[in-house]
Amino acid sequence: TFGKNGVVLWRCANGLENSPVCNMGYRPPVKSVGRGVTCVDDLRDNDEVWRVLLSLSHAVSKHLREDGLLAGGVQIGIKNTALFTSQSQSKLIYPTQNSREIALKAFSLFKQTYKWQTPVRAVTVRAIELLNPDKPQQLSLGFDMTRHEKLERLDKAMLRINEKYGKGTVVEATVLNGTKMPTTVPSADKDISFLP
């Protein structure tokens, strides 16, 4: 069955769909921002997965900044060599656009859920529960706002340098060790996601 989309499809097919026509140039609100990649070689340990998650998180962070949104949570998708796909998600303590915070949450989810019975073939990172940065945020006890602001300044500086001098001019040292990602990584204007 198609669930609630089945009703919409049936109504459209039978000429009963009566929602108003959208204005030209209308863009529906963004619900999530994600990047994913099928690696050129299987990922066999946590260090290799961390480097891929960090690279993907930089792309997600860039897209969040372009759209002026904050991530309220992170979702990961993992496909192993048996082509089994699993997804997990978690809320962030404080909404962010920061690539390191997104990557750390994604890696935490990965370590909690993946048991290494088979190597990893593909990885997806998605920012979910998107928020407007102008909306007031509830501070949380135990959240290090000073560290958050420092990481935010670092992320913005890296982004400015990469925009001025070209992608990959400044990267985190961890990524220099190799990511097993294709040399042509999905660009920031293409969303890739796993289908259920």
Spans of model-derived segments:
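DNA-contacting surface of Y-family translesion DNA polymerases
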Residues: 1-119, 195
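Acidic, metal-coordinating catalytic segment for phosphate/diphosphate chemistry
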Residues: 92-196
